[in-house]
Amino acid sequence: MKIFLSIYFGFLISYFSYTQHYPHDHMQYDFIDQKHNELVIFNKKKWSSFLSKIHNQWHYGGEEINIIQFGGSHIQADVWSNRLRDHFQHIVPYNGAARGLYFPFKLIKSNASPYLKTTHNGEWKGFRNSVSYHHSPFGLLGARAELIDSTSFITFYVNKEHCVNCYFDQIDFLIHDSLNNHCIDILTDSIVSIELDTDRQSFILSNLVDSVAVLIERESHEKGKFSLFGLNFSSQLKGITYHSVGVNGASVPSYLRCEYFMDQIDLVNPDLIIFSIGINDAYEPSFLSETYFKNYDTCLLYTSPSPRDETK
């Protein structure tokens, strides 16, 4: 059951103030009047169903709950969003969920999460849905890296200073390989299963890890085009997975450019979708509220369940 919540200029959560585990300190500002924070629920039945899953996870465990939030630079930076993720990881004793969706922005020379880090060699070219002259296609994560060299060696590793017990045992690569002549090789002997599809490759490991090394290599002289749209780090353990998707400068139309959005969102099957976009729309001199609301409505329609899904 999917729940859809639009948040235009901010989203503050006090529900999880129960926990004392904070990855960052934060300031209290007098000019923020939290009495005006309000959640408007349009479908109380769905909302109650979502809260019921949260309740069961809190008390008993065993639930698979996926929350995905879309935003701009505040989400790409991953400081605030990782705080939410850290809360979800530590607020209940049963939560073993992994990182979730991730784009390695270092590959395209942009700022990346300080919590799941990457190093790499090999040259890549970057594209973002927020840059008008960056051509498509784009996927769920709003960015794309195209491999220029014939090989690239990438390591992904958890920053243990800020993320305790952050492990994964499955990695999904969201890709497009125009000539099907590139190989993704996970450099470990603990692979138990590999699933290869046209635009997705999944690797299941025999044990939980907090780092992995990957070799992407072209296998023929024909160049073709290898595009990486992002990854999903998941775990067989149950719990709340908080996926954060952010691109510097992203506006509402930016995500409407992502033609692989719906194909790739099935990978996480979200229970709750949060749109935290709008600031980059509103400050433009050409801003029109009618266009803004129309674009937002289109986003909501794209991500709303079909009538058939409503009956499930």
Regions of interest found by a model, annotated:
Residues Y302-K312:
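Single conserved hydrophobic/aromatic residue that forms the stacking wall/gate
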Residues I68-G71:
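Short hydrophobic beta-strand that contains or immediately precedes a catalytic carboxylate
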